[in-house]
Amino acid sequence: MGLKADNWIRKMALERKMIEPFCEANIGKGVVSYGLSSYGYDIRVGREFKIFTNVNSTVVDPKNFVEENVVDFEGDVCIVPANSFALARTIEYFKMPDDVLAICLGKSTYARCGIIVNVTPFEPGFEGHITIEISNTTPLPAKIYANEGIAQVLFLQGDEKCDTTYKDKKGKYQAQTGITLPRILK
């Protein structure tokens, strides 16, 4: 399994629409950087957020998630409360090849501020916007800047194609748009 370089990422984005919209340059002046890098792609966070709240005294249950756990926010800067959590989505829409797995890591700019970004792997055959999990581990409110970088995606190409892709198994988050809350198939 090999880590893919910028020339491969560029080719897949331009010829196969693996990443849309695609930014060929790495933009970093005055913003949290985003775009193509040597061995990855820095994704941007959109303007929509779901911020966790305790206003309704609910319990977070991944098997029975209720909308009252979050409040919707849209804007250029999202303030994540101290020791709190938010969901967001990428600006970019991904179409993963059947022999490629992507792993996403938070950007050091945010990590050095106590903001941890988690994204589960993009499985072969997955298509959709990426839901981003953002944890503010500090005792202070923290800013997240929309339309700027939030994490880096690394692309790993398998030595052979898998038997069953995410699309083949009709994954529950396939073709998601916007921020997708937890789902349990019944």
UniProtKB/Swiss-Prot annotation:
The keyword Nucleotide-binding applies. One of its GO terms (biological process) is dUMP biosynthetic process. The keyword Nucleotide-binding applies. One of its GO terms (molecular function) is nucleotide binding. Gene3D superfamilies: 2.70.40.10. CDD domains: trimeric_dUTPase. Catalyzes the deamination of dCTP to dUTP. Homotrimer. PANTHER family: DCTP DEAMINASE. This is dCTP deaminase.
